[in-house]
Amino acid sequence: MGSRGGSGGDGAESHGYAADIHSIREAQARIAPYVHKTPVLSSTSIDAIVGKQLFFKCECFQKAGAFKIRGASNSIFALDDDEASKGVVTHSSGNHAAAVALAAKLRGIPAYIVIPRNAPACKVDNVKRYGGHIIWSDVSIESRESVAKRVQEETGAILVHPFNNKNTISGQGTVSLELLEEVPEIDTIIVPISGGGLISGVALAAKAINPSIRILAAEPKGADDSAQSKAAGKIITLPSTNTIADGLRAFLGDLTWPVVRDLVDDIIVVDDNAIVDAMKMCYEMLKVAVEPSGAIGLAAALSDEFKQSSAWHESSKIGIIVSGGNVDLGVLWESLYKR
């Protein structure tokens, strides 16, 4: 783990970031009718294993099964009627796709969803369930973006970016507001990182409320571009990714990178075996089924890297963002059986 970054609450509002505490509070008011205020769970058994008090913000119980509905609904309900009339388009491997489809359905407008051919079946089914118009792409981010651009040009639909967008970031940040409203004494939050929309929103909100709070990212070893970016001081992309955490394969955007660079204190990298072990622990001790991307925060809290760091010694009450629960049960049981 590297040195702490970031300058706290004032910096979170004054350095020209895409979002701030004000846009996040506006998002909270805007999306309140359309999202769940998800529960915060705890387990004395898990606390004993980790050696700290953990508070799990369970976005696996969110509408569409993940935190993504926060950013999607904020983006879609922020559109004026003329902008919304031609619908919205996005590209996503799963959770954001379903969230956009659902938010568009709630707004009564069409949603064009570009999905890579390797997306998990359970997540594709969610998009269909919410009435999204699916357009397939190849698996690369370049293909996804190219197809989304073509659909946008053909339909006039507004792009709802999965992470690199002010309204998306602001919507995701509302999860941090809820967590700290319920457990204000939290001193560290561990957040999954991929494109950076969630952790950017969490960091901007949390550090505005409590400048001394620590924000840690959790990232899979097979898709550790954020850790490499943090070390290099610039955005690093990878030629390919290989991880069970299918929701954590995107790379940082130009709007999320400055927040990650400045306000994320450290990035903990864990392997897929650790993620599966954390999924099992969530199921056995929290009685909650979570997807790999949602379990990675617990995996990070259990890691030797964290326990050997100053962050572990300086933390007592740790928030864990359980980002989603859209897991293919067949994959879940196969993974748990192998462990």
From Swiss-Prot:
Mn(2+) binds at residues 219, 223, 225. Its cofactor is Mg(2+); Mn(2+); Ca(2+); pyridoxal 5'-phosphate. Mg(2+) 1 binds at residue 187. Inhibited by semicarbazide, hydroxylamine, aminooxyacetate, sodium borate or phenylhydrazine. Racemase activity is enhanced by Ca(2+), Mg(2+) and is decreased by ATP, Cu(2+), Zn(2+). Hydratase activity is enhanced by ATP and is decreased by Ca(2+), Mg(2+), Co(2+), Cu(2+), Ni(2+), Zn(2+). Optimum pH is 9.5 for racemization and 9.0 for hydration. GO terms for molecular function: ATP binding; D-serine ammonia-lyase activity; L-serine ammonia-lyase activity; magnesium ion binding; pyridoxal phosphate binding; serine racemase activity; threonine racemase activity. Catalyzes the synthesis of D-serine from L-serine. Has dehydratase activity towards both L-serine and D-serine. Homodimer. This is Serine racemase. It comes from Oryza sativa subsp. japonica (Rice).
